[in-house]
Amino acid sequence: MQRVILHCDMNNFYASVECMLNPELKNKPVAVCGSVEERHGIVLAKNYAAKAFGVSTGEAIWQAKQKCQDLVIVEPHYEQYIKFSKLAREIYGRYTDQIEPYGMDECWLDVTGSGCMGTGFEIADEIRRTVKFELGLTISAGVSFNKIFAKLGSDMKKPDAITCIEADSFREKIWCLPAADLLGVGRATEKILSGYGIHTIGELAATSDDFLKCRLGKNGLAIKKYANGLDDSPVMRSDYVSPVKSIGHGITTMQDLENNAEVWCVMLELVQEIRTKLRTHKKKAGGIAISIRNNELFTKEWQCRISIPTQSPTYLAKTAFSLFAKNYQWEHPIRSVTVRAINLFEEDCPIQYDLFTDVKSLDRQERLDAAIEQIRFRFGKDAIKNGVLFQKSKMPTERKVDLVMPTGMIG
């Protein structure tokens, strides 16, 4: 039996919620932006009126203002976005319990067993009309026989539209589209493909396995399967909890970081949050990954393994900083830093030590970190901290970016 998969994408979600809650913003160009003072002064979302002026997500506010002098800037209200995201999922739940979120504003739905409610298109259209009537928001929906093409369909027509991609006609409909439109083909992959003259989904579908594996590894074989409609990944049930794959924190600093000492201070603060999340999820880090974005907005990433899985923020910070110092060349000041704990192990997993492991030192450090955490829990996070953190910090006082990543359905 062929599956019927929907992908529902709430159009310009943040901006649409703001405009719905503030009717005076209707028909005005609106951009939801972070705090200018704390260097989150970029466009997080924009409505279609702003898009018509060329305003782009991710650009600085001053750049957006140059394109549209009448642009209305509003601050994000995340509690409202969470509320409306939940309300939308409650509507989806009227049709199936197989609902898999893909971010706050997107979901896959498997309605294969909901045939009594209509065809895939009919169900998608009813959901679209219900969300519009009950929530005042619009969605675009893709209807297909797998998750990859359902997602592609929801991107093809916006806003407030439905696109069907059928098994017997998908080649004619999507093989002419840019390869970058396919989920799993990011900017780096697109650049590699285009360098070899592979520009469309159809060209990707016809490329040899050996060539793709040589140039892109396992991901190359995966995206070729997607291009040929070969995706059998399931839509998870609404109550399914994905295993955690990595835990991290990232921050955009109030001022650019200009030396190793400033980066060290930032990493020390970030790993304290990571430690808390590791404890919450009962995990230990078996590796560290860092992502560094410079003031030219170019990002570099590195990762390494940790010989002994740990929750120690001190050990995590030292490992992250060592990785940074070894690789970053200081060609430009740094705008943002992200640290992630990867290769996670269960908290109570048995540990195999080698002959060269300083077990006493490691145990002493972990007990010290645990004592510090208890003091912070009882008296507040500023009750005790590293001496270098008492100097003037470039860390913003408000929002850090939590990165708790479940295992993905792709790859």
Residue ranges of predicted features:
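Residues at or immediately flanking beta-strands
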Residues: 138-140, 289, 336-338
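Short, charged/polar surface micro-motifs in flexible loops or helix N-caps
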Residues: 13, 36-39, 295-298, 344-347
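Gly/Gly-Pro- and Ser/Thr-rich, intrinsically disordered tail segments characteristic of DNA damage-repair
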Residues: 1-225, 235-238, 276, 359-411
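C-terminal hydrophobic structural anchor segments
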Residues: 315, 321-378
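Short, hydrophobic beta-strand segments
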Residues: 107-113, 301-304, 352-357
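Short small-residue beta-strand/loop micro-motif enriched in glycine and branched aliphatics
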Residues: 72-73, 298-302, 349-350
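DNA-contacting surface of Y-family translesion DNA polymerases
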Residues: 7, 189-333
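Short Gly/Ser/Thr- and Asp/Glu-enriched loop/turn motifs at secondary-structure junctions
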Residues: 102-106, 144-147, 283-287, 332-336
